[in-house]
Amino acid sequence: MRIQRTLSNKKGALALAVLVAALAGCGGGDGAETPQAQANPQFPNSPATGTPESPTTPVTPGKPTSLVAPSCLNCGAVDSSTYAGTGVGVWQATNATSAAADVPVSIDGLTGQDVTLVFTNESGVAQPMPAISLTASRFPSVAASQLRWQDPATDAKQRIGEFNRNGWAALAGSQGTGPRYSMSSGPSKSVVNDTRDWFNEDNSVRSTTLVRQATTTDGVTVNFWVENSENGPTKVSSAIIDQLADRFASAGKVYDMLKDVGGPLWGSHNYSNLISGTGQPIDIVILNFDHNNAPYGMTGYFYARNAIAKSASNPYSNESLSLYLDSETLYLDGATGLTEVVMTMAHEGTHAQNFYRRGVLGGVQYMFATWLEEATAMMMEDFASATLDPGHNPIRDVRFYDYVKYKGGSYNCSLLDWTPFSASCDSYSVSGSFGGFLNRQLGLRLYKSLLGNMSSTNSVDVLDTVIKTNFPGTSFVGQFRRFSATAGALIPAATSPNGFGFPARSDNGYNIPAIDPTAYAPYRTLTQTVPTTLQAYASLPVVRQAVKGRYTETVKVPAGTTLAVVIH
């Protein structure tokens, strides 16, 4: 489901036995959510160029030893120990050993640029983080003044998410050998002004009225139901409903984009206890979720229990293909709230679509892990945003903003460990920001392939396979390294080397805007304490400010971790 926060202001000692300059993809861990390790693979700087992601560069004789290698082409990294003096330079080295290792770094040619050390753990398990000196943020007072959070309740979203991922299978009934093997009767026809009671996710009963019907370009009926106490000119007005109907059902809008990218939201199946696979309308049910007189929090949800027939073991089913939206968000924050709910329809529609495509048709074992499930929903928002509201992009305006500032930044937060709005991490911002990076670097081709790929029941392996298949020479680890370097060093959009950054992209009519990480510098709060561990598939930036001449430091890098040195 989609959660939206309220923001106060949006806008060793051990020698290097194995240290590969040509970056090694470190697998490892217990095998859970970890791609297969490879021996010294080469990754290209860009899927289109076929050039090595981190070419081997010999150390220049007479210069201090520097065991990092340039990781960008036509950029500020001249060789392993020289910066061009302008632009962005990226150097990398991977510690493929099982213990922390010293990496000497010596780079000449700086004229006052910042040096950012970005540690990216690619091992699949948390690694002990060695001691390192830290630098205070340049903007602590600005960032601290804006750290006012409204933490949404997590129980509901966790319960719904877990049910959608695997809880539904025990209630779906027996499977036949062909489609439409369902004991559930087909849907009844509704007309405007019909009344109906709906179960909210908390099992409370809400009385509603059907206030509007729309028809999609392929003939699917879309019903808009509004809770009676929320229906009216000062709350959920007819003008608001008109806008929701237009942006969901009109040609080229949410429904058409969802179907174009990922296929139908519902259809034939062979489960006996699921609702009929034919003739289903889409019900959009607008309820006051929590009666807290405030917008946001949980702005919407898709709950798979409603696609299962009502029974003694599933007594709160609405027996409907339905999306649920928060009414207070629609009318308590004007156009901004309306935009968030419109994006929520794209987000929750993706969850519904994933449930049908991957769960019902593929099998419960192919449902994405939560981190990737939510990432795909936020990636769809990203692709849809320019069509729905050209002035708003959820990755640029919300997710990446939160990534760099949420309670000291969500850097050392595992991509795989779903902890939204926790004491130190916001998983929505982590998955959303990485998804936004993949959208801009690899595009719609990757996204479409990801949605339908069932080559593994391990979500990391699925993403890794899709990247390698569509863009030979790169990988999940390679892309995560580049994302980490981009986000950790706030690489400027104007001078991002090929393969780094968040560039604008257009794919078959889907347009996504560029994101300039440097614009977020005033809001970033760097960690002031070295963490005990570097989490699995997480990164940590450490900044050396305004360096002139030669930057020299021996950096202790955790096991299974890549060190990126970024200068700009």
Over which residues does each language-model region extend?
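Bacterial N-terminal signal peptides that target proteins for export
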Residues: 2-15
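Bacterial Sec-dependent N-terminal signal peptides
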Residues: 14-65
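Surface-exposed intrinsically disordered loops and tails
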Residues: 51-52, 308-317, 394-425, 485-488, ...
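Beta/coil-rich, acidic/histidine-enriched accessory regions frequently appended to metallopeptidases
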Residues: 55-98, 106-108, 457-568
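Extended intrinsically disordered, low-complexity regulatory segments in eukaryotic proteins
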Residues: 64-162
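Acidic/polar low-complexity interaction segments
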Residues: 93, 119-122, 134-236
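Juxtacatalytic substrate-recognition/specificity segment
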Residues: 220-369, 376, 387-388
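Acidic/His/Gly-enriched intrinsically disordered linker/tail segments
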Residues: 343, 362-431, 441, 454-482, ...
